[in-house]
Amino acid sequence: MNRTASTEEGPLVLGIETSCDETGIGIVRGTTMLANVIASSMEEHARYGGVVPEVAARAHLEALTPALRTAVADAGIDLAAVDAVAVTSGPGLSGALMVGVGAAKALALSLGKPLYAVNHLVGHVGADLLDADGGPGHPVELPTVALLVSGGHTSLLLVRDLVSDVELLGETIDDAAGEAFDKVARLLGLPYPGGPQIDRVAAAGDPRAIRFPRGLTKPQDLERHRYDFSFSGVKTAVARWVEKRQDAGEEVPVADVAASFREAVADVLLTKAIAACLDHGVPRLLLGGGVVANARVRQLAAERAAAAGVELRIPALSLCTDNGAMIAALGAQLIMAGHEPSGLGFGADSTLPVTDVHVV
């Protein structure tokens, strides 16, 4: 079993995260989180029923400097004292990424500090290094399978080494799980963001009321897409079910639909994640991403992991959503492992593969 480095006296790293709609500035020393400031533009996107890339980029421009000032104050440090700057260079929304990358380059250049461009998805794995209350962090035990689920990504990773050996086992071939939650919420007349709304309404529903399809779980699908996900089918099935009831003049049982949809998504996510653990002989599963806030996903993960004899790791919910502290933590791991900084020649890469943990 391998472990990531863990030390309270590690490098002091400032992390910048702007891959989607949350502006994150985090400061860590080794694996100890000193500050984690998140400014969300969710309310602005709610008017449009989803994330608008141009709105997200503009919001990052407005939020970065205030968030940076707050993070430095929270950490109780002088900005010049940081040892390095780390930034998400991808994957994500191009315009949003450019704001963070540009700010990180300017900051690193003005401070005369090394800059590390890192992968957003691997950053979610790095979140497990941190204690949300600011206490000493802890190592990530490796190898681990990581299930990362958000509005923009649904990915299954095999992490043998956090900074040098990350394999993509599978990902969504259409909608991300979080995106499907948003679209189904809209069908049910629920506001954006859909995930929390469906979770709230589903609590009063029967998850067995309607059997919605589980994408890419049939035997013929598993041959080619054993670890891949598909949520467009279940989204369409919900739409047709609701439309049929409405056309018949019947009342739509929103709570039952929400609970049944939530159950279908959670079932697929955990079926494939546990299968990946067992197939690869990996005794632990790490969850990350905003959809991990879903109560049924967490509950089913605990049930399936216990039944399979797999250790389940879930960072604090404040660290599961996009944040700068996880980026800083990954940057610190790169430094402690002796990796070279990125320099200033890299750019934002909206399709950065997960195998590229660090862009040089």
Swiss-Prot record:
Keyword Cytoplasm: yes
Superkingdom in the source lineage: Bacteria
Subcellular location: Cytoplasm
GO molecular function: iron ion binding; N(6)-L-threonylcarbamoyladenine synthase activity
Entry EC number(s): 2.3.1.234
Binding annotation for Fe cation: H120, H124, D322
Residues reported to bind substrate: L148, V149, S150, G151, G152, D182, G195, D199, N294
InterPro entries: ATPase_NBD, Gcp-like_dom, KAE1/TsaD, Peptidase_M22_CS, TsaD
PROSITE patterns per the UniProt record, alphabetical: GLYCOPROTEASE
Family recorded in the similarity comment: Belongs to the KAE1 / TsaD family.
Name recorded for this polypeptide: tRNA N6-adenosine threonylcarbamoyltransferase
Organism: Leifsonia xyli subsp. xyli (strain CTCB07)
